[in-house]
Amino acid sequence: MARYRCCRSQSRSRCCRRRRRCRRRRRQRCRARRTAMRCCRRRYRRRCRRY
């Protein structure tokens, strides 16, 4: 299981399964694999399913 951190908003970032403290910083991205970082963005929200 990959560990995804909350990026931006919890509701928008489905990729982040483990919802930890979402920082207010917008630059806060999912700290995991390259896919996770991409999945964090709304454009890649659909790709989050795989991860």
UniProtKB/Swiss-Prot annotation:
Output one GO MF annotation: DNA binding
State where the protein is found. Nucleus; Chromosome
Keyword set includes DNA-binding: yes
- Give tissue specificity per the record: Testis.
Record the organism.
Piliocolobus badius (Western red colobus)
This chain belongs to the protein called: Sperm protamine P1
Q: One of this protein's GO BP terms?
A: sperm DNA condensation
Report whether Nucleus shows up as a keyword of the record: yes
